[in-house]
Amino acid sequence: MGSRGAMSASGKLKRQEWKGVGKMHGIKILEKINAKENRGLPWYCVQPNTAYILLDGEGKFLQLRQYGEDRSPKFDVDFGKHKPLGGQEKIPHIHDYVNGIRQPGRFMTESEYNEYKKFFQGDE
């Protein structure tokens, strides 16, 4: 994906919207080409079973999106304020996708936290 753009649900390439700006623990970091547009990660990816990372304006981890075999999101690992889970405190949490719909955030399991905590270093 990266500099080539994202795929639409129909499998066609969309206009170039993203660029790769580096890697974090082996996962490509994406950045919007037009910073004025919505900053969320792409809804589809070119390579099945891919993950991408989004950083905040200060270069700190904001989100990791894991895509499945069908190139649609499986889950998002977020690090930020989430009112239902932690009020105004930044907390790591997960949003699963069920039938393409992003679910409310949930606390991470211990094994999920252990797998993804490397992305939160210096942020907690």
Regions found by a protein language model. Give the residues of each.
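Catalytic toxin/effector domains delivered as secreted proteins or via bacterial secretion systems
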Residues: 2-124
